């Protein structure tokens, strides 16, 4: 139980850290992104970059949670659901600032991407075991 809680909390922290680092990269590397961020007036390319950022953060969170939880395959799913519950209110607040497809892509892929990150780690671990 303690290991599952640690795995879930760490997965959530990893999501925030990865997203923050990648967002910093977007600010530094994508022309106009830093200026567009305060008003959320992103171009299509910027919106796609933000969705990709979220996907990488979700994959990392799932892999981290799975690595720590090991024998509890439900933990990454719990992490994904917690993230979804945390993000829905924020997306409702900014609903008018983004097209519907943006919100739907982010919210509907959040839980599956966390689970997929966990599955990728499990698959990699299974193939790395000596025969």
PLM regions: where:
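Juxtamembrane/disordered regions of integral membrane proteins
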Residues: 1-131
């Amino acid at each position: 139980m303690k290991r599952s809680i640690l795995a879930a909390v760490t997965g959530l922290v990893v999501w925030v850290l990865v997203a923050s680092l990648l967002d910093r990269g977007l600010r530094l590397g994508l022309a106009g992104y830093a200026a567009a961020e305060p008003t959320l007036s992103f171009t299509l390319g910027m919106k796609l970059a933000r969705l990709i950022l979220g996907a990488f953060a979700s994959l990392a969170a799932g892999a981290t949670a799975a690595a720590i939880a090991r024998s509890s395959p439900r933990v990454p799913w719990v992490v994904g659901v917690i993230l979804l519950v945390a993000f829905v209110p924020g997306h409702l607040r900014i609903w008018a600032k983004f097209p519907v497809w943006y919100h739907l892509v982010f919210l509907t892929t959040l839980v599956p991407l966390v689970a997929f990150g966990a599955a990728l780690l499990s698959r990699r671990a299974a193939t790395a075991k000596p025969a």
